[in-house]
Amino acid sequence: MLQNIFKRVIFMKRFFALTAALLFAVFCLSACSGGSAGGQGEISVFYYTFSDTYISGVRSSLDKILSDAGLSYNDYDANSSQTTQTEQVQTAIAKGASALVVNVVDTGSDDAAQNIINLASASNIPVIFFNRSVSESVIASYDKCVFVGTDYEMAGHMQGEMIGNYLLQNYDAYDLNGDGKISYVMFKGQEGNLEAIARTQYAVEDCNAVLEAAGKPAIEFYDAANANKYLVDQDGNWSSAAATNYMSTILARHSTANGNMVELVIANNDEMALGAVSALQSAGYNKGAGSVTIPVFGVDATDAAKAKIADGSMAGTIKQDGEGMAQAIKTIIDNFNAAQPPLTGIDAENTVGTQRVNVPYSAYTGE
């Protein structure tokens, strides 16, 4: 009798232990899974590099939004290597990723983005490209693909208009050698990148349109021998170091004392603008009262750029809303999870068709 009771007690203990273990396992699986039309698993977010200041801001915003929502995610740093990023995508898919959020490295051709779509579509996983340009034909090739970015041409237009109006406020003061024209240098972030191409072109064209409407001549690139009329980051990293090196070389030959000083600096992004400011300050410019200040303009409105605008060493920037970009990505992920059209709930003014979101720009001069 006692032996039978003992056996029953042992059985019940084992039963309850097994039940508890199963319930715990189910709880863990549900807590760790983001879930989506692409299957159970984490959201995999791929950045072209962690070292880009603007992208770091997007990453911080997206990490917080996903964490606050209780979604499981993993961030990948490609360190500017498309080969690395493609391998990371393959690994994430093999691990059962629920969605791929991709800041693609190679924007010079469609091959990289199309390859990622091919990998994702084979496993029915949604893809959200963001920030770095992907062609419309690539996006349209997969019905579970969305691009979150900007109307990339608009940044150049807005920057050019801002620069033109800024120069007109005190044109003679910015014309340091009194020749009636403003000389400039343009720092381009990357060859073959649609955003860099548009910013480089339209910043100058729209600035000239503003000046010429006011009866002023077009701005002139400081080096007549440079047919491109820009200096590009040869590594394609839009980096402050590239701009600092270029600007330091320029300042070794051009100065107010020589009467040939570069009178305006235009950069494709704030990192390059800040690099130019660093070189200028090392040469004694843009240091506040008592020093000559060269107007410097960027794009992104990073915290570092805002600080330089506040102290007067930088003139203005175009805000690219990283937090707004992160929120749009989260909304699209939710829509895929709920099997809704991906752009549901996003302001129609910021959408193009059914597969693109343009986060709006705004001018920032510290006012």
Give the location of each predicted region.
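Flexible loop/hinge segments that line or gate small-molecule binding clefts
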Residues: 116-154, 158, 172-181, 187, ...
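Hinge/cleft segment of the Venus flytrap/periplasmic-binding protein
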Residues: 178-183, 187-191, 195, 207, ...
